[in-house]
Structure formats: C-alpha cells, structure tokens
A protein has these predicted regions:
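Short gly/ser/thr-rich secondary-structure transition/capping motifs
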Residues: 41-47, 71-75, 113-114
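NAD(P)+-binding Rossmann beta1-loop-alpha1 motif at the extreme N-terminus of oxidoreductases
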Residues: 1-62, 88
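Residue-level signature of catalytic and energy-coupling elements of molecular machines
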Residues: 4, 70, 91
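Alpha-helical scaffolding segments of alpha/beta enzyme cores, especially the outer helices
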Residues: 52, 79, 103-106
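Short, well-ordered alpha-helices that flank and scaffold nucleotide-derived cofactor binding pockets
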Residues: 17, 21, 75, 106
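Short, conserved loop/helix-junction motifs that constitute active-site signature segments
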Residues: 80-86
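Rossmann-fold NAD(P)-binding glycine/threonine-rich loop
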Residues: 89, 94-115
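Beta-loop-alpha module in the N-terminal Rossmann-like domain of NAD(P)-dependent dehydrogenases
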Residues: 62-78, 94-102
C-alpha cells in the first residue's frame, strides 16, 4: 500500500516520521521544500503537486493548519478528492472547525471517496 502525506509542519512531521520509520511506502508533499527533503532523505518519495501525490496513493493523509489550507489541498480539479483513485481513503488530521469537516465529508462523498 502506498500512503500520501500532505503537510509536514510540526504535527505532520512527527506523524509522517513514524509512518516512514515503520517501512510504509510514503509519498510526501509540503509547500516548504526543506520539509519535503527531510523525508526524502529518510526514504520517502516526493510529489511536485497535490494532484500528482493523490493520483498515486491508496491512502492520503492531510495535516494542515487552517480550514482554508485543507480546502486548498482537497477541493478543485487539482485536489485530493478529484485525483485519489476510486476506493481511496482520506484521513484529515488538520485543525478544522466542525462546519468545514461536514462540508468536506459531503464533497468527498459526492466523488465516491471516504473522508
């Protein structure tokens, strides 16, 4: 199984680090190239875009700081929901309000994805 991880800040880095250390095949993406390089050095592969990452994984984990950031990586033609393969699962570990969570779950469901 290949896992995608988007958001390698303080929280995301700690979580993703444990996944990589346990030998899981991980593809990473972050807006900060230095954060990505740290995980490439640990054995993860990287994606140049969210779309590229989502298209090649079965499980996608996001861990971003704000609702606007979550919407930015999940929605739209280049987002996770449009590009995660059929049957793909998304786990959101982001800091979100309940209204955003409910909206994102509905958007995922429209596309046959699990949120």
């Amino acid at each position: 199984m290949k896992v995608g991880f988007i958001g390698l800040g303080k929280m995301g880095a700690g979580i993703c680090s444990n996944i990589v250390k346990n030998g899981i095949d991980v593809v990473v993406y972050d807006i900060n190239p230095a954060n990505v390089q740290k995980f490439v050095d640990m054995g993860a592969s990287s994606a140049a875009t969210v779309k590229e990452l989502a298209a090649q994984v079965e499980v996608c984990i996001t861990c971003v700081p704000m609702p606007k950031d979550a919407k930015g990586v999940l929605l739209g033609p280049d987002g996770v929901f449009e590009n995660l393969p059929e049957g793909g699962v998304h786990f959101d570990l982001s800091t979100l309000d309940i209204e955003t969570v409910v909206m994102l779950e509905a958007e995922a469901a429209k596309r046959g994805k699990k949120y």
